[in-house]
Regions:
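Small-residue-biased structural context
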Residues: 1-241
Length: 241
């Protein structure tokens, strides 16, 4: 835990964190899990199914970015830490348990669905915490400067990820979830700013022209206006093309 700010001292101004496009996607996943849990507790299979399918669509994009870019990047700077920790194998476990939920959705027995989903949820929440513990410290080793790390995120994650047919949808979904539900430690406006500002700093001008309108229409207007004024979200992407 960081030291408390002394009385009368100004808090350090926030800085853009490009790797937050991965970290705060975890918070969108956690928000989706909370919505699914509430739907199951209410016996609302329709809402549960809608939120489950949305989360799985977003998770597929996020996992592909990890499988095709993030794990190899961090293994290279962390002496194989991601592979040694079994993170890629955990993705296979996650997919196996998710298939069990998909099968249970066709079963009229709500208890069977709750059982299958609880097994997936417990594994997935553990996986998110495991990834954060292993991966987040390694991100600082990818380049010596914030600008260098932003370029790494652009080259290894944003540009390849943006080739996915669902990437634009993914950006909108993450912003929607964060701006309405926040994170486990951040209120909605902060969680949203961390993700969107990080994405802007890891995008070329052309990419940000593509992503910014998606983020804006996925965010409550008053929140977007405040963030745009405070953090220059209406200016261009920060990676030189």
């Amino acid at each position: 835990m960081p030291d408390a700010v002394p009385a009368g001292a100004a808090a350090e101004a926030p800085k853009p964190m490009p790797f937050a496009i991965m970290r705060n996607a975890h918070e969108a996943l956690r928000a989706g899990i909370r919505l699914q849990e509430a739907a199951l507790e209410a016996g609302d299979r329709t809402t549960f199914a809608q939120e489950w399918l949305r989360l799985q669509r977003g998770l597929a994009v996020h996992m592909a970015m990890e499988d095709r870019g993030m794990f190899a990047l961090l293994d290279a700077v962390g002496e194989g830490a991601c592979s040694a920790a079994g993170l890629p194998a955990e993705h296979e476990d996650d997919r196996r348990l998710a298939a069990g939920v998909d099968a249970a959705l066709a079963d009229p027995d709500l208890a069977a669905l709750q059982h299958a989903w609880s097994a997936w949820r417990d594994e997935h929440l553990h996986h998110l915490e495991h990834e954060e513990a292993v991966m987040m410290p390694l991100t600082m080793k990818t380049a010596p400067t914030p600008e260098g790390r932003a370029r790494i995120v652009n080259e290894r994650l944003v540009t390849p990820g943006a080739e996915s047919a669902d990437f634009d949808w993914f950006v909108g979904w993450v912003v929607e979830m964060l701006s309405r539900h926040g994170s486990s430690s951040q209120p909605p406006a902060v969680a949203t700013r961390v993700f969107v500002w990080g994405l802007q700093h890891a995008s070329t001008p052309d990419q940000w022209r593509r992503f910014r309108p998606i983020a804006q229409r996925s965010c409550p207007p008053a929140m977007w206006d405040e963030l745009a004024r405070g953090y220059g979200l209406d200016t261009g992407g920060k990676i030189a093309a």
